[in-house]
Curated annotation (Swiss-Prot):
Disulfide bond residue pairs: 367-442
Segments forming domain ZP: 188-466
Xref: PANTHER family: ZONA PELLUCIDA SPERM-BINDING PROTEIN, ZONA PELLUCIDA SPERM-BINDING PROTEIN 4
Cytoplasmic side: 527-540
UniProt cross-references to InterPro entries, sorted A to Z: P_trefoil_CS (IPR017957), P_trefoil_dom (IPR000519), P_trefoil_dom_sf (IPR044913), Zona_Pellucida_Domain_gp (IPR051148), ZP-C (IPR055355), ZP-C_dom (IPR042235), ZP-N (IPR055356), ZP1/4_Ig-like (IPR054554)
Propeptide residue intervals: 463-540
Modifications after synthesis and translation: Proteolytically cleaved before the transmembrane segment to yield the secreted ectodomain incorporated in the zona pellucida.
Species this protein is from: Homo sapiens
UniProt protein name: Zona pellucida sperm-binding protein 4
Family membership: Belongs to the ZP domain family. ZPB subfamily.
Glycan-modified residues: 69, 202, 219, 267, 302, 470, 474
Membrane-topology descriptor: Single-pass type I membrane protein
Known function: Component of the zona pellucida, an extracellular matrix surrounding oocytes which mediates sperm binding, induction of the acrosome reaction and prevents post-fertilization polyspermy. The zona pellucida is composed of 3 to 4 glycoproteins, ZP1, ZP2, ZP3, and ZP4. ZP4 may act as a sperm receptor.
Ranges in the topological domain labelled Extracellular: 19-505
Amino acid sequence: MWLLRCVLLCVSLSLAVSGQHKPEAPDYSSVLHCGPWSFQFAVNLNQEATSPPVLIAWDNQGLLHELQNDSDCGTWIRKGPGSSVVLEATYSSCYVTEWDSHYIMPVGVEGAGAAEHKVVTERKLLKCPMDLLARDAPDTDWCDSIPARDRLPCAPSPISRGDCEGLGCCYSSEEVNSCYYGNTVTLHCTREGHFSIAVSRNVTSPPLLLDSVRLALRNDSACNPVMATQAFVLFQFPFTSCGTTRQITGDRAVYENELVATRDVKNGSRGSVTRDSIFRLHVSCSYSVSSNSLPINVQVFTLPPPFPETQPGPLTLELQIAKDKNYGSYYGVGDYPVVKLLRDPIYVEVSILHRTDPYLGLLLQQCWATPSTDPLSQPQWPILVKGCPYIGDNYQTQLIPVQKALDLPFPSHHQRFSIFTFSFVNPTVEKQALRGPVHLHCSVSVCQPAETPSCVVTCPDLSRRRNFDNSSQNTTASVSSKGPMILLQATKDPPEKLRVPVDSKVLWVAGLSGTLILGALLVSYLAVKKQKSCPDQMCQ
């Protein structure tokens, strides 16, 4: 970093000092373009110049180099229009350094000085922001799959491969129009303040109806496509028209618009169908208000992809009991039966296993407990009814939200709740608790997509939303705990435990005995006190 500062300081200092002893040489005009991956720097000779300029650059050690085509160092020199020279240097070039969120490259123009000695006649520090949004080069499938007759020019020829791909377009040196749009959506935000949006019909499946693609906020003739082929449609319009919105935040101005398309509807004698999803394309260009430069951000927002195709297959479910409220670990098969005290909390989790579809949602329909492994056996006690806590229990079930975590990438595949342990009562003997195991069971189903209104419901008297919509569910399945729970009475009864009735005669005898004992203790205490307070001769 110190060396870089020294190099920059030396370059700046040489500019100031050499200004006094600068040899007579033609002035040059130059233009810098910050591309997605490289500098594009064009130097133009004025009319007095007799020879093309020679470009030079300083490396990180401060050494001077004449620039030439060097793929190892990421520099290319080509002749531009007229007598101009164009330099293209990648941001990973040997002569480029990262500095204060920018890529910088000190360059110069070399000319003839006194006695025909070569001297640096012009110096410039190329500087491009690092956060300039880079467009990905189109995939080869997006380019090769377009027939030559359907290709829509992206930029006029001649143009280099780097410049073309820097625009997010396809390149073919064998074609007359060497730079053309790929099978996708390509957005350009121009320095002059225009949108340029190219849409391929194959950006969706089935393909788009191109003649139905239009701007959502304005549909007059001035906002119609400027060019169309069988495979593409191209919109170009200024930021001040076609319903474009502008929002200024600090130093940034954001211009936004939206494209929509009509669905392809097939009409039959008994109804109409469509196989198209909704097409809505949101585009955005951001500019710096205080700088007359290229856009600082270009974004295309498409709707989420359609849900993946489903196939029939087994759905594996699991009901587990966690060892604590954090759900950090669970009881395994070898840990059962789980021994708990009455009124202890039990933390339950029901999960979908071996699925990676983020759109799946797990629904708990009914959950209940039985004294045997048979979920249909009697007696039964309801825990959840239609996914909500059973309101007839004075210790109501608590629904626990599931948060996304590193070990839980699909929270919609899990449902959690806690219950307070209880014991079944013998129906033949009044208020006699049945001793033995308690098994948990749940009936569950799956809905899609998860966390949408069709998959949630608000439980009565609860603010928490629960999954519930029979129209979006598959067949209900059942799952049970891996083993039973053995419930024990606590060694110390809680305050609300029922009192045992006691005979009044027993209470009377106990009270009289307590009174006599207290009286004897009082007499003994007074005697001892009197003995300590009197002199020995008087107490004898």
